[in-house]
Amino acid sequence: MEELVFTFPTDELWKLLPYKKKGLIRGKSEVLKKIVLNGLFLRRSQAEEDPSFKQIISYAIISNEDSFYLFKRTSGQTEKRLHNKFSLGVGGHMNPDDSPESKEQYLMGELRRELSEEVKLLNGCLIEDIEFIGFINDDTIPVGRVHIGLLYNIHVSNKEVYINETDKMTAEWIEKSDLAEFYGRMETWSKIAFDSYII
């Protein structure tokens, strides 16, 4: 059966948010609630080709004090456009959830699921806070016209964070002051997060 992904009508989205062709639109929790209550699931093949809907993607930065967990995607990943690119965020598409959680809890549940797929927290490392930052949009490229990112910062209690799929990516903690060295090879959404949130 084909994957179903969570989407929201593009025209309706820009009635809720100030339009920005490329960049970060600062957090509005009331908009998040409207998205989760009124979004719908579409077949991924349809959603990838239909800019009248935006696929909702969770995109989470992991931080500990003034350090950020920087990912490097390897050639083991299926998405060739991202090979050897650096990324500040983990996340992905949101799929149907059959658990009894309320719709309001759905986004957070999907974010935590994506996080657990990508990394493991060991040796007492705990999530101290999950901060919603805003919406990342990039309508300047075809893939961006059918996606919008929900940018979060996940604050963890120590640096005992490890990659699950080491054949697909590597990662290391980088001090905030050193992140700019990696900017040229960051993927687009990471550049937006860096420009509009981190610096």
Locate each region found by the language model.
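Short, extreme N-terminal leader segments that mark the start of a protein/domain
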Residues: 1-25
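Extracellular structured ligand-interaction cores
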Residues: 3-5, 53-59, 149-151
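Nudix hydrolase/Nudix homology domain
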Residues: 6, 44, 84-98, 134-199
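Short, flexible beta-strand-to-coil junctions
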Residues: 8-13, 63-66, 74, 156
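Acidic, metal-coordinating catalytic segment for phosphate/diphosphate chemistry
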Residues: 20-67, 73-77
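Conserved Nudix-box catalytic region and its N-terminal flanking loop in Nudix hydrolases
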Residues: 67-114
